[in-house]
Amino acid sequence: MKKLSTNQIRKIWLDFFISKNHYFLEPVSLIPVDDPSLLWINSGVATLKPYFDGRKTPPSPRLTNSQKAIRTNDIENVGVTARHHTMFEMLGNFSIGDYFKKEAIELAWELLTDKNYFDIDKNKLYITVFNEDIEAYNIWKDVIKIDEDHIFRLSKKTNFWDVGQGPCGPNTEIFYDRGEIWDPNKIGPRLISDDIENDRYIEVWNIVFSQFNNDGNNNYVELPRKNIDTGAGLERFASIFQNTPTNFETDIFYPTIKKVEQLTNNQFKYSIDNYFNPNKKQTRINTAFKVIADHIRATVFAISDGVFPGNKDRGYIIRRLIRRSCVFGNELGIKQAFLYKLVDSVIESMKEFYPYLVDKKSLVEQTIKDEEEKFLKTLSKGYDLLENIIKTKNTVSDKDALLLFESYGFPIEQTIEISELSNVTVDIEGFKKLLEQTKQATRNARKDLKAWDKQNELFTKLKVESEFTGWSEISRDNAKVIYMFTDQKQVESITDQEVFVILDKTPFYAEKGGQAADSGIIFNDQMKGFVIDVQQGPMHQNIHRIKVQDTLKLNDLINCRVDEEKRIYTMKNHSGTHMIHYALREVLGSSVMQSGSYNDENGLRMDFTYHRLPTNQELLKAQNLVLEKIKNKVDRQTYFCSLEESVKKHQALAFFTEKYDEIVRVIKFGDFSSELCGGTHVNNTSEIEDFIITGIESKGSGLYRIKCLTSFKTVNEYLNEQFKIYKDQAEIIIDKYNQNKDLLKNDQLENIYLEIKNITINKDNLILIKDLLDKLRDLNKDYDKKVNDLITANKLLKYKDLTPSLNKDNVNEIKLETTDLNIRDLKQLADDLRNKYNDLIVILLSSTNENNFIVVAVSQSLQNKYKAIDIFNNLEGYETKGGGNANLAQGKFVKK
C-alpha cells in the first residue's frame, strides 16, 4: 500500500470525485450560518442541509468536499483514545437526487482499491450493511464480488442513520484490517460483528442511503428524491497510510508534539513504543502531548474563523480547550504561556489546503497568548484551592471536583493524581453524575438537532424559473404570474387572501445577503395586491407574499411597483455597510471579519469579529473615512465573474461562509471596497449623502455589532432626537440644582449646563455633548453630596449639645429618640458623637412618617466588652431588624 501524506490523501480524494463529475465545495467556516440548531459545523454534510432539504438548489447534484468540523460533547476522551479529536476533517461525496446505492458503492470501491488512487489491498477491507438492506448486501456480494465472510449484516443500532424525524436510511460501512499486531487478544472479525472498540479494524468510510422520511413516530415513507451522504475521516486515513499506532503520530499532529517536546527543554518525551508496551507514567505523559496537539489545532482554526475565547457558547469551548491545554502543559513542566508558540506548527502542516491561516497567524498567536496569561493566574488559584481541600477534608467531593474542572480547568485525572499523593480520595462517580447533568442541561438548552426538516415536496418539485430585474428597475409592467400556492398547496386562483406568487420577471428584491426584502404593490384592471414580503426559493425564484384584493389568477399579467422610498434608503444603507466594512478594516486591520449584517430603509447594522472593542477614537476615524469616500463621489462598478476571478482580479472579500454560485456578482467602489454581493446599491457614494455611527455593542467574546445611519434626512432626524434627549437630561439636573441653589451655588455646573443648552446640533458636537453631559452628571453627583452634607449638618445643629450619661454598667452612653432624622443622618450623628466623646456607646432612634430607623455605635476602646451588633439585637423594649458589626449596627425597629 502507498505511503501518503495528509495533503496527498485529500488531493487524491477530491481529484477522483471531480473526475467523476462532482462539484468541489470549498471548505466553509466552523461557524454555522442560519442554523441555530448547531453550535459548530459538526460534520461534512452539516453545511449541505439546505441542499438536502430542498431550501436551496445545489450547484450540481454531485458534490464533494473536505470539510473541517468540531465536536466537543466528549472532550474528556481526547488524548485518551487513539482516534478522538475536537476538530477533524471529513472527506465526503454526496448525491442529491442523482446516483444511489450501486454507483455510490462502486465509486467507493474504485477509489479505495484502484492502483491509480489509494491502491488498498481488497482482502483487507470488510463491509457492514443493515440486515434488512438486501439491495446493498447484493451489490457488495454480486457486483463488487466481496467474499461473504467479509460482509456483516448488522442491526439498526449500528447501520441505520435515523435521528427521530426527517430524512433517514440504512448505511454501509467500510473497515480496513491493519493486522493481528493490533489485535493482541486475537479476536478477529468478531471485533466488527460485535461492535467492539478496537485498533485493528478501522472504519474508513460510512455511506448513508437517505431514502426514507421518518414522521417522528417511526413511520417511514420513501422520499421523493433519494440522496447519498458519505463521510470518511481524513485523520483515520492518514493513520492507515502512514502506519501509525494512533492518529497522533501522523503528519497532522506529530510535528506539533515534537515542538512541545522542545518547549519542555526535552525533559519530557512522547513515546510511540508506549502503545505496545504501556507504562502508566508514560501513558499520562503521552496523553498530555496528545491533548495539547489536538486542542491547539482546533483553537487555531476556530480563532481564524472568528471565534474568540469567552464565557458562553463557542467562545467558552475555545476557552476550555486553551485552559485544558495549559493544565496538561503544566504537567509537562511548562509553567509559562506556551501554546501560542505552537500556532506556527499547526499552520505549517495545514496551510496547503487552508492558505488563509497564514494571514491570521499574528491575530491567533496574540489571542491565545492573552488567554493563556490570564488563565495561568487562575490555574495557580486552582492548585491553592485543591491543596486547601486536601488539607481539610478526607475526600474531594463531587461538587469540589466539578468546580475545579469547570472553573479552574482541572481534568478529573489531575485532581485524582494530586489527591492520591496525600491519600485523599475523590468522589469520581458523583463527579461523573454532576458532569453528565451539566452536559444534559446544555444539550436541552441548545437542542442540537441533527434532524433536518421534512422535505418540502412542493419546494423540491418547484422547478419554474424566474428572473430578478430589480438591479436596474423598480417597476415592471406585464409580469406574468407563473406559480401560486398557499399552505403548501398549489392554486390557480385566489380571492381576498394572502398567497405566495412567483412571477416570470420581477423587480422586487428577496430578502438575502443581509438586505431586507422590497415591498410595494401589484395591480391590473381586475385586482390590486400588496407585496408584504419576498423570500428566495430553491432555484433562486423570488417568492412574493401578497395580500390580494379581488381576484388574482395563474397566468395573469400584472404591473409591479416597488416602494421607491424604501428601496432608495435601503440601497443607501447597504452601500453604507460596504463602506463601514472597508473603514473598520482600514482602521483596525485585516483581521476584522464581517460575520453578518442587516440593512433596511431605517438603518444598518454589521456584525464583525475582532479581539477587542474598538475605541471611540477608532470609531470616529472609521466614520470620517466613510464620510470622505461619500464626499469623493466614487462610482460603483459591478462585475459578473467566477469566484476565482472575483478574488484574483477584483480582490473581492467574501466573508461569513456564504455559499456562492459558479458566477458571482462583485460590487466595487473605487480601489478600496470590493465585495461579493447580490444586493441593491447606490450608483455613486455621494448618493449615500451622510453617515454616522450610532452605537456598538458586544454580541459575545470577540464579536461586535456596529449600528449606523445614512442619508441627510435620517442622520438629521437622529441628531435632533439625540440632542433633545441629552438636553432634556441636562434640564432635569439643572431643575434639581435650582431647588438648592440658595443653599449652595456652583458656577461650573451652571456654565456646563449653558454649554449644553446652547450647543449647535451637528455630528461633530455629538461626542462633545455626551462628554459635557457626563461632566455635568459628575459635577451634580459631587454637588448632591455637598448639599446633602449641608442639609444633614443643619439638621444636626440642634443636637450639638447632647452629652453622655452613665448607664447601668457605669459606661458613657447617649440615647436619643427623635422624629426628623433619616438613616444617613443618624449615622453621621453617631460618628460626630464618637469623635467628640471617648469610651462611648451611642443609641439613636428616629421615627419618621415612613420608617423607624435605628443606629447603634460603640467606641473602639469598648469593643472588647460591648459590641454594637449585640446591643442592637438585644435592645430592651425594641424589636430590631438589620445588621452590622462590633463598631456599628443599623436597621429598623418596632417598639414592643
Curated annotation (Swiss-Prot):
Enzyme Commission number(s) of this protein: 6.1.1.7
UniProtKB keywords: Aminoacyl-tRNA synthetase, ATP-binding, Cytoplasm, Ligase, Metal-binding, Nucleotide-binding, Protein biosynthesis, RNA-binding, tRNA-binding, Zinc
Transmembrane residue ranges: none
Annotated Gene3D superfamilies: 2.40.30.130, 3.10.310.40, 3.30.54.20, Bira Bifunctional Protein, Domain 2, Threonyl-trna Synthetase, Chain A, domain 2
Cofactor: how bound: Binds 1 zinc ion per subunit.
Localization, UniProt: Cytoplasm
InterPro entries the record matches: aa-tRNA-synth_II/BPL/LPL, Ala-tRNA-lgiase_IIc, Ala-tRNA-ligase_IIc_anticod-bd, Ala-tRNA-synth_IIc_core, Ala-tRNA-synth_IIc_N, Ala-tRNA_ligase, Ala_tRNA_ligase_euk/bac, DHHA1_dom
A Pfam family assignment: DHHA1
Catalytic activity: tRNA(Ala) + L-alanine + ATP = L-alanyl-tRNA(Ala) + AMP + diphosphate
Class in the EC hierarchy, top level: ligase
An annotated Gene Ontology molecular function: ATP binding
Cofactor: Zn(2+)
Gene Ontology annotations for the cellular component aspect, listed alphabetically: cytosol
Disulfide bonds: none
Residues reported in the UniProt entry to bind Zn(2+): 574, 578, 677, 681
An annotated GO BP: alanyl-tRNA aminoacylation
Family label: Belongs to the class-II aminoacyl-tRNA synthetase family.
Function field: Catalyzes the attachment of alanine to tRNA(Ala) in a two-step reaction: alanine is first activated by ATP to form Ala-AMP and then transferred to the acceptor end of tRNA(Ala). Also edits incorrectly charged Ser-tRNA(Ala) and Gly-tRNA(Ala) via its editing domain.
Entry comment, domain topic: Consists of three domains; the N-terminal catalytic domain, the editing domain and the C-terminal C-Ala domain. The editing domain removes incorrectly charged amino acids, while the C-Ala domain, along with tRNA(Ala), serves as a bridge to cooperatively bring together the editing and aminoacylation centers thus stimulating deacylation of misacylated tRNAs.
Protein name: Alanine--tRNA ligase
Gene name as annotated: alaS
